[in-house]
């Protein structure tokens, strides 16, 4: 069999960025396996932004004349318009987003000018940079969504006021706490997620552009200028690391998985609280669903989907880590598999978070039901033990005495507060009638006024600190977004000069 010399079958056809050393094109099976446009096309805006910065770097180094630079930038503007409008889409012949866009650029600028843009860069440093740009933009979106969720939880905490609920350990009654305290306990992990996103961005704020395939470039292009044009603080310190590192992707996937876990824990409680057995919350009709056969059902689908999707986020992280664990330096094609998992995690959270926040903002709490259940399960026993300690009884003895008191109440089928003075004395002479001063849920909550405690005064302080921290994180995120937007505006503005 002779090999085809038809240019349409060669690897170097439009839409592919390689092929000169091959006598023929790839097999259809390889083409199908290699094609990535079904997921990397969403990087097209970032690819075009990178091409603008690269064109300016080529011009600064003398590889494009002023006229060519201007024509190239104008062609890239036209390319961007065609992508945005849908006039240009990836075709079956395009291996990836880079090849599809080069094909589109050559249609606009011609092959001679369009073909000059590839000098001094590789798909390896391109894709490493574009993924960072995509993730940084979507990190900002998710950051803003998380802030809205924290705001919704904080607003519910403020509205709860002094409402008391059963606090639990091992899902058993433990001690009474303020509902506001419990809701704020879900805010702080989300605040740490916000901080993780900010910490991550500091490490992601490095441009691999200029690293080439792995060893850098001989063309003397200003990688620092490209980095600044694309909104990065600096360029990569090591060209091999620049093209091969994906820890920044894995770390981002971890942060999103952790967000999913934090949502899942809150979801589990909402699902329980929404049952008749608990009866703590009522879901808004707008944020719940019904049954196709049982007319009475009102299901907590958002919470259940959040709980389920947390497993998906964990799976995406696990798959990505498994892909990375055995790769030698530098770039390997395995790294094509880094994008779909993290893209899926981004898209999952960006759909989930608005619905979840709406569910939280519209929850109605049955605080009477919560207060009714708060003293059950002998939840004031620790208050009795600590009262004894304050009256100079060793805690070991106080614990034993209180345990006997619980046993006595349990045997009579009553609560601690229902025991008579004779019942108290029968357990221990230390249990004088004055112990009743701690046998109320209001007194128990108010007495826990140490740092981080559930007393109203401490919870109000905590909520104020939460508001301050979130405002600080929001301001930092807004400032970072403004810096990136200014860099992008400055870079794109040159095309119209």
Curated annotation (Swiss-Prot):
Its main location: cytoplasm. GO terms for biological process: arginine biosynthetic process via ornithine; L-arginine biosynthetic process. GO terms for molecular function: argininosuccinate lyase activity. It comes from the Bacteria. It holds the Pfam family ASL_C2. Disulfide bonds: none annotated. It catalyses: 2-(N(omega)-L-arginino)succinate = fumarate + L-arginine. Pathway: Amino-acid biosynthesis; L-arginine biosynthesis; L-arginine from L-ornithine and carbamoyl phosphate: step 3/3. Belongs to the lyase 1 family. Argininosuccinate lyase subfamily. GO terms for cellular component: cytosol. This is Argininosuccinate lyase. Keywords: Amino-acid biosynthesis, Arginine biosynthesis, Cytoplasm, Lyase. It is found in: Cytoplasm. It comes from Clavibacter michiganensis subsp. michiganensis (strain NCPPB 382). It is an enzyme of class 4 (lyase). Its EC number is 4.3.2.1. InterPro entries: Arg_succ_lyase_C (IPR029419), Argininosuccinate_lyase (IPR009049), Fumarase/histidase_N (IPR024083), Fumarate_lyase_CS (IPR020557), Fumarate_lyase_fam (IPR000362), Fumarate_lyase_N (IPR022761), L-Aspartase-like (IPR008948).
């Amino acid at each position: 069999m002779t090999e085809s010399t038809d240019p349409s079958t060669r690897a170097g056809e439009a839409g592919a960025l390689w092929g000169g050393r091959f006598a023929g094109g790839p097999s259809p099976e390889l083409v199908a396996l290699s094609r990535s446009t079904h997921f990397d096309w969403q990087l097209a805006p970032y690819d075009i932004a990178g091409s603008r910065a690269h064109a300016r770097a080529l011009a600064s180094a003398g590889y494009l004349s002023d006229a060519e630079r201007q024509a190239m930038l104008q062609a890239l503007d036209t390319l961007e318009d065609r992508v945005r409008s849908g006039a240009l889409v990836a075709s079956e012949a395009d291996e990836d987003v880079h090849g599809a866009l080069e094909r589109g650029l050559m249609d606009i600028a011609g092959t001679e000018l369009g073909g000059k843009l590839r000098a001094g860069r590789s798909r390896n440093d391109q894709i490493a940079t574009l993924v960072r740009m995509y993730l940084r933009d979507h990190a900002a979106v998710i950051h803003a969504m998380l802030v809205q969720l924290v705001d919704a939880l904080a607003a519910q905490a403020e509205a709860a006021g002094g409402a008391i609920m059963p606090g639990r350990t091992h899902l058993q009654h433990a001690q009474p706490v303020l509902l506001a305290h419990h809701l704020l306990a879900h805010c702080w992990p989300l605040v740490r997620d916000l901080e993780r996103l900010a910490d991550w961005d500091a490490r992601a704020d490095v441009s691999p552009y200029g690293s080439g395939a792995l060893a850098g470039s001989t063309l003397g292009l200003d990688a620092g200028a490209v980095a600044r044009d694309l909104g990065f603080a600096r360029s990569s310190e090591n060209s091999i690391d620049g093209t091969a590192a994906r820890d920044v992707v894995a770390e981002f996937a971890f942060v999103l998985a952790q967000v999913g876990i934090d949502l899942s824990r809150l979801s589990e409680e909402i699902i329980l609280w929404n049952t008749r057995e608990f009866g703590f919350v009522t879901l808004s009709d707008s944020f719940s669903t019904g049954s196709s056969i049982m007319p009475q059902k009102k299901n907590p689908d958002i919470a259940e989907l959040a709980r389920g999707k947390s497993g998906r986020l964990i799976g995406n992280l696990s798959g990505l880590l498994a892909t990375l664990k055995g790769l030698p330096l530098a770039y390997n094609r395995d790294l094509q598999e880094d994008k779909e998992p993290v893209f899926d995690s981004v898209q999952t959270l960006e759909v989930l978070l608005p619905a979840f926040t709406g569910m939280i903002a519209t929850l109605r709490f049955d605080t009477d039901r919560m207060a009714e259940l708060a003293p059950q399960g002998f939840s004031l026993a620790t208050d009795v033990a600590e009262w004894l300690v304050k009256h100079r009884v060793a805690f070991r003895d106080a614990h034993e005495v209180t345990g006997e008191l619980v046993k006595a109440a349990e045997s009579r089928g009553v609560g601690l507060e229902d025991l008579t003075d004779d019942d108290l004395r029968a357990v221990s002479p230390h249990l004088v009638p004055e112990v009743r001063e701690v046998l109320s849920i209001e007194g128990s909550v108010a007495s826990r006024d140490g740092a981080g405690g559930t007393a109203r005064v401490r919870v109000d302080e905590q909520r104020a600190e939460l508001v301050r921290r979130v405002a600080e994180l929001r301001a930092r995120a807004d400032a970072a977004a403004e810096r990136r937007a200014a860099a992008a505006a400055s870079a794109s503005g040159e095309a119209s000069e």
